[in-house]
């Protein structure tokens, strides 16, 4: 293997995801990572079940995952990508999202599906990273968004 070959990680279980992200129930929206190519991209999975608390009110009789949570799931996948790529695990640094652009919702996300989150770095400059994200159900595009985040220390009291 050449030194220029990308470093590929995966699959990574939820314990590794939780080591990278500060999110916990009910807002941890990445269940596992299928593949992570350091400094490039990530493919992660969110298993969407009827037991999700948001389905109680969104919508009774026609449960659909809120679009904002689909975007949050993509953002969390991007957070794992950033933490693993930049060697931030255990550093205490957090990934703070600054902008979300060009969000498009293509198809409803209903209980019983595996939502595949594909996120790639679009640009890295200092502590600021830009990402392109897509969420799929099978081969069908459910949502897409571009977002920008910065890596920073958590706020102090």
From Swiss-Prot:
The keyword Isomerase does not apply. Pfam families: FabA. Its EC number is 4.2.1.59. Keywords: Cytoplasm, Lipid A biosynthesis, Lipid biosynthesis, Lipid metabolism, Lyase. It is found in: Cytoplasm. GO terms for molecular function: (3R)-hydroxyacyl-[acyl-carrier-protein] dehydratase activity. It is an enzyme of class 4 (lyase). CDD domains: FabZ (cd01288). One of its GO terms (biological process) is fatty acid biosynthetic process. Belongs to the thioester dehydratase family. FabZ subfamily. HAMAP family: FabZ. This is 3-hydroxyacyl-[acyl-carrier-protein] dehydratase FabZ.
